[in-house]
Amino acid sequence: MKKVTDSFFVSSQITVEDIPEIAKQGFSTIVCNRPNHEEIGQTDYQKIELCCAQNNLKFINLPMSPGHLTSDLIDQTYDLINEENKTFAYCRTGTRCITLWACANVKLNEVSETLDQVNQAGYDLDHLQDFLEDIKAS
């Protein structure tokens, strides 16, 4: 798990066994940014969703296939980060989660600040700077 902000964290794939610990850490929402069946052995989001309900966590399924970033996904992520609930987002490596967060965050903050936060979380999205500038300008 990598901290992006005090209220937004990203991670690689989780399992149902991880959910109780995530709940103990004070998260209120888990977001799945990964479609089912990307690889053998991946825990289906429905199992994660059920376990979230059993642990009083809100679950949101926002699957993003690699290379299929949409304005709808960005808008939904924007809504999430504006709620300011402690949110745990996961995908295969965390890269899709941090990408969606960055695209949403530039609507609120400067691109350079956003990329700095991304880098501090251990990711490199500098190649998306022009794209993020376009989102910021729109």
For each feature predicted by the language model, list its residue ranges.
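Cys-dependent protein tyrosine phosphatase-like superfamily
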Residues: M1-F88, A102-S138
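A phosphate-binding catalytic loop at a beta-strand-loop-alpha-helix junction
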Residues: F88-I98
